[in-house]
Design a protein with these regions (language model features):
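Active-site-adjacent segment of SDR/Rossmann-fold oxidoreductases
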Residues: 152, 174-184
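Substrate-binding pocket helix/loop in short-chain dehydrogenase/reductase
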Residues: 102-104, 108-113
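C-terminal helical subdomain
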Residues: 181-184, 188-189, 208-250, 254
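Residue(s) in the substrate-gating loop at a strand-loop-helix junction
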Residues: 147
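The beta1-alpha1 cofactor-binding region of Rossmann-like NAD(H)/NADP(H)-dependent oxidoreductases
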Residues: 65-77, 109
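Conserved glycine-rich cofactor-binding loop
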Residues: 12, 19-21
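Active-site helix of classical SDR
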Residues: 127, 164
Length: 259
């Protein structure tokens, strides 16, 4: 941890999508920084497995199952963890999804709605849950895992995914506008390609060689950790992190050729 960073001892962190990928790696980072970490997701077995593995490393991990698309489910999970540990100091929204059929010619209304509900509405549900406690505590850190697809348009992530991630930018800006006066700072965190399970939803699965070029979840977790452990007067409002070999720069032409 750099000289600029502050520890998370005694704080409660909540990671949605915490069972796998970026969420899991971030939960581990936060736990090593001293936080008690609650992880949420829909797949309870996956959450319990992750929690057991991280507890074996000496980390304080709570399992709080929740479907981020369901506001009542999110509120119930938040009530459980805050009832045990007090207000959430750090929220990382890492739950996300995509669908294989991504172009207008193949995408269904149901597929579009599913992606929007999880990637956008799910973030709003989690933020709604934690804001009152953060205001009362005099501050907090929220990191919303978006995507490079929400920072610059390319067609290969698909219209539903790109729309859901692009909408997170004004969501974050509005939060910093309204909640910064209460000590709450929010980051629109935009990673490029990361080797996570969401790759399985691609119409053209990446090769092992392509996956080897991507960011690792731990790379992203390190950057998220830097964001949420910055001094309280510092707001990193947007972070873009990408692999050196960046498919967004080549326009996904390799995917189009193979599709």
């Amino acid at each position: 941890m750099g000289a600029m960073q502050q520890g998370l001892d005694g704080k409660l962190a909540w990671v949605t999508g915490g069972g796998t990928g970026i969420g899991r790696a971030t939960a581990a980072w936060l736990g090593r920084a001293g936080a008690t970490v609650a992880i949420s997701g829909r797949r309870v077995e996956e959450l319990e497995k992750t929690a057991a593995e991280l507890r074996a490393q000496g980390l304080r991990i709570e399992v709080a199952p929740a479907d981020v698309a369901d506001a009542a489910s999110v509120a119930a999970a938040h009530a459980t963890i805050s009832g045990r540990h007090g207000p959430v100091s750090v929220l990382v929204c890492a739950a996300g999804t995509n669908v294989p059929n991504r172009s207008w010619s193949k995408l269904t209304p149901e597929g579009f709605a599913k992606v929007i509900q999880i990637n956008l509405v799910g973030v709003a549900n989690a933020v709604h849950a934690v804001l009152p406690g953060m205001r009362a505590a005099g501050g907090g850190s929220i990191c919303i895992v978006s995507s490079l697809a929400g920072w610059t348009y390319k067609d290969f992530p698909g219209v539903a995914y790109s729309s859901s991630k692009t909408a997170l930018d004004p969501l974050v800006q509005s939060l910093n506008d309204e909640e910064g006066r209460h000590g709450v700072r929010v980051c629109h965190f935009c990673p490029g390609e990361v080797a996570t399970p969401i790759l399985r939803t691609r119409p053209v699965p990446p090769s092992d060689e392509e996956i080897a070029r991507m960011l690792r979840p731990e790379d992203v977790a390190d950057a998220i950790g830097y964001v949420v452990s910055a001094p309280s007067h510092v707001c990193l409002a947007e972070v873009v992190i990408a692999p050196t070999w960046n498919r967004f720069y080549i326009g996904g032409e390799d995917l189009k050729r193979r599709a």
